[in-house]
Each structure stands twice: as structure tokens, then as C-alpha cells.
């Protein structure tokens, strides 16, 4: 140590107390660490089965909630035109529907679109029925974006939407038999679609009631 007095600098030897080894400021109660510390506890690492079961539990609760809320209304979008145009003349309409049905099947999706012959919900749209030749056919879906796309493809159709509390209510129809005359001269290089191709897209409740 150095002591400064006036202008003189005198060397003072360190005392014995200053030379003592000072203890570390760490409690002796801590255990001696012989291994590297881990920032995360091994008990926090959960197996993948835990997340799988959690997901199943969440999915189950969602299903239960949806079953409780069956009384809530759902919005349905639809395109409608006369049956002759929609089912017999507009051939690429059939191709669009079967392509979408194949897409849903490959990805195991629940079908959300249907064809409804003479739908009962048209009674609530007098402005549409005034412009519509009968019998009429509607393409109904809960997917508004896809219905907008189909409207651009079909062009000569009318669009609107409505709400219903059940699928049976939304897809209810009046019994109608469709018969189209076969063309006298078919010039296309492929055979014409057979009548009844649309049965695949009719609501299941309608098919069962017709039996």
C-alpha cells in the first residue's frame, strides 16, 4: 500500500490483515457443482404422445361445442339457374363439380357443396324467381369464395345467400322430375353426359326421401 503525505511519497508495507485470503461471497450451503448446469430442466421435455393426446382432447371439445351449438344459424351461398342450362347445356359445370369432389376425397374433407333441384328457399327471393325459368337448380355451399369463383365460370346464373339453422332446412326441395331431350346432332368428339349425373351431388336427405 502507498501513503501520500504532503509532497513525499512513502512506501508502507502491507499489513498482515491485508494479506489474508478473503473468502468468496458465496454461501457454503450451496452444493458443489461437478457437472455443467443445464438451463432447462429435463422434466420439461414432454413426449410427442402428450401433444397428440392434447390435440385430440382439444378436437373433442370442439366437436362437443359444435354439437351444442347446432341451433345456431349458418350462412349458405347459392347460384341458381334453370335446370336445362345448369345440368344439360353447361357441360364444364359437371366437370367442375366432379373435380372438386375428387379434391375433397383425396384430402378427406367434408363435402360442403350440393345441388338442390327446385329448392324451397327460393320462396324467400321473389326478385330472383321472377327472372328464373323453371324447373330451377341451385348450387349451394357454405364456402362463399368458391361460389363467387363458380359464378364467374358459369356467368349466366343468379347469386344470393341466406341463413338456416340446419342442413335439412337449407337444402329442402320440392319433388321434381327432370327430363331433357337428347340433341339430334351431337358433333362433339366425346359422348354427352348421361342424365342423372347430378344425383351424386344431391343432398343425402333428398336421396333417402326419394326412395
UniProtKB/Swiss-Prot annotation:
Extent of the transit peptide: 1-80
Transmembrane segments: none
GO biological process: chlorophyll biosynthetic process
Disrupted gene: phenotype observed: Accumulation of MgProto monomethylester (MgProtoME) as a result of decreased CRD1/CHL27 accumulation leading to reduced cyclase activity of the MgProto monomethylester (MgProtoME) cyclase complex. Leaf chlorosis due to a massive loss of photosynthetic protein complexes.
InterPro entries linked to this entry: Ycf54, Ycf54-like_sf
Alphabetical keyword list: Chloroplast, Plastid, Transit peptide
Subunit annotation: Interacts with LFNR1 and CRD1/CHL27 in chloroplasts.
Similarity field: Belongs to the ycf54 family.
Name used for this protein in its record: Protein YCF54, chloroplastic
Gene that produces this protein: YCF54
